[in-house]
């Protein structure tokens, strides 16, 4: 596991060859947006907690106490999954939140060797079935496809039962990559999800990033100089969608609206990409200790 982490560190250092220590003109977020980013960071955090992936029908909870907004709502998991025998060991859940009238899909970030194998399998694969000229990270796309059919079926049933509820897809790190790719496919299928990701790596080429940007309804959150959003490197053709919500405050601090800069532009070299000292600790703190259950 340490070796795999070092491979990602090497990739991030390669990314720094094109990064510039620049920063766009800050545009703070509203209190409402901050509230949404905070809420869905806690939904992403819940995916790391094992009680949310092995007991369908229970309320969503976090044994480390890092998802109080979720725990205070009227929630029930409708489908929990941990595909240990499938490529990428994708884990997470689909839940209903009757308090906020939400259907939430939350993908777990990296925990197992299979997760890391999917992470470092970053050769491009054809994604023209998603959009013209698009190429995706091979490992992430294959991992999404391992759960796509069953999960989409469960979402379809949930949408029929909970008419008028908003569909949200979220995840941190590897889970954020799956949320992004899954979100594109679900939008193409007419489901119209909002996607919130935290510390996600790049998932495809510039054409894919532009397509995601044009679809809209993406809140891609980064934190200071977090290592993971810097990989796979832009030098080999990977790109991020826009906009980026860049948290500029440090670890273990309360984030305010003025601590988040909105960075606009596909493949921008500002925000997280403009920082020069990749930090693994920054990856764990997204409006709270997001992977405390890991």
Language-model segments: residues:
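Non-catalytic, mobile gating and regulatory segments of ester bond hydrolases
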Residues: 18-170, 174-294
């Amino acid at each position: 596991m340490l070796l795999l982490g070092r491979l990602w560190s090497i990739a991030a250092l390669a990314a720094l060859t094109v990064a510039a220590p620049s920063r766009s003109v800050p545009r703070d977020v509203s209190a409402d947006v901050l509230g949404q980013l905070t809420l869905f960071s806690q939904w992403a955090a819940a995916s790391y907690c094992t009680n949310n992936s092995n007991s369908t029908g229970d309320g969503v909870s976090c044994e480390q106490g890092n998802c109080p907004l979720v725990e205070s709502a009227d929630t029930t998991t409708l489908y929990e999954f941990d595909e240990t025998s499938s490529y990428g060991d994708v884990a997470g859940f689909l839940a209903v939140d009757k308090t906020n009238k939400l259907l939430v899909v939350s993908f777990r970030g990296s925990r197992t060797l299979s997760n890391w194998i999917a992470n470092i399998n970053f050769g491009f694969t054809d994604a023209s079935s998603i959009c013209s000229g698009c190429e995706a990270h091979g490992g992430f796309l294959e991992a999404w496809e391992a759960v796509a059919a069953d999960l989409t079926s469960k979402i379809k049933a949930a949408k029929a039962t909970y008419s008028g509820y908003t569909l949200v897809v979220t995840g941190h790190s590897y889970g954020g990559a799956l949320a992004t790719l899954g979100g594109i496919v679900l939008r193409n299928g007419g489901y119209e999800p909002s996607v919130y990701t935290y510390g996600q790596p790049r998932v495809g080429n510039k054409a894919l990033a532009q397509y995601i940007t044009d679809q809209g309804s993406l809140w891609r959150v980064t934190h200071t100089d977090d290592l993971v959003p810097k990989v796979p490197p832009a030098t080999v053709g990977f790109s991020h969608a826009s906009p980026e919500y860049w948290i500029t405050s440090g670890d273990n601090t309360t984030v305010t609206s003025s601590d988040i800069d909105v960075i606009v532009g596909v493949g921008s070299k500002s925000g997280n990409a403009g920082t020069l000292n990749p930090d693994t600790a920054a990856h764990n703190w997204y409006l709270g200790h997001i992977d405390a259950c890991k």
